[in-house]
């Protein structure tokens, strides 16, 4: 995420590396990734760094020791890194950036503040006291010091359908029904973008949406303007249905993410239908939101982890039971939900309570949570009349149903 082609101003030969400004999608991405004017090939060539090295980075009054990796997913959730992307041949490409996995580097390290407009477009302003360009220095801390973790996180995928002969078209698009405990039958689906052609999967996903009868969609990745600009958008099944466009980043603790997610959950609560949650890959933002909804509806710990990890099989062939599988789960969805729910051991937590408390904390009311659960297939238990109590007909049933629905917002 946050990948782009940047063309910074022509660099002077003074040997300095800088973050040149605040321009959106040149120096700063919507996720808070920060680009420098150092070419990746120079970083690896002239400066002598390599993937798997630990490097000391200095800027402003900050000193960090960061691993050099090809993408944010090579570090645990919440951890920063130096990003040097790989091209199709495995060579360094583009410009050196810094990012936090599921976080916002620019704001965390007080470089810039993000602002979001009502139409979900965004822009950056300098942090108080910061002027641009900002000089950055890189110095080797430990050659190969991150290599063990690097190998564990090393994941390879392609966007070529022919490379995934064992997957159905829907699986290739990372599209699937969520069928965890408590979830209604064929009510909620998740996956990659049905409109963004970047991954070569959008047409497969759009076809899967149609087959599933999806008609209420939460788009975590785009603004409406951005979505409608994709080639062929108007001809998609997707475009003819109810969609909320949230254009969210990946810092799940950020107020703007939580505000946007609350809007998305209210949208689901207010619109009955067959639901779809997606971002770009259907991996991080959609992975978190899907897990949250699974927990809300009564899923077990094992179910939540297993559903999240299906994505890593669909894209990367990561098999359950392997060290890589466990490392990815522990450093991503388990850690993310522990932070969201404020618990130390997710496997021992009351996941439904955690989800409800989280939703209340980001602004949902008990009534909205109840509506959301009912729309996702929650059926309130109807208690049988006791022998000592005369049958009360419809009125009695109404009492029991009422108690069941009232309990939704509590500890059901």
Language-model regions, residue ranges each:
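Cys-dependent protein tyrosine phosphatase-like superfamily
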Residues: 115-275, 288-390
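Ser/Thr-glycine-rich phosphate-binding loops at phosphate-binding pockets of nucleotides
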Residues: 281, 285-286
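Long, compositionally biased stretches
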Residues: 2-120, 127-133
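A cross-kingdom C-terminal cell-surface attachment/processing module
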Residues: 396-412
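Extracellular/luminal Pro/Thr/Ser-rich low-complexity repeat and linker "mucin-like" segments
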Residues: 15-34, 183, 258-259, 263-267, ...
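Extracellular Ser/Thr-rich, low-complexity/disordered mucin-like segments
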Residues: 385-401
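The Walker A (P-loop) glycine that initiates the GxxxxGKT/S ATP-binding motif of P-loop NTPases
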Residues: 277-279
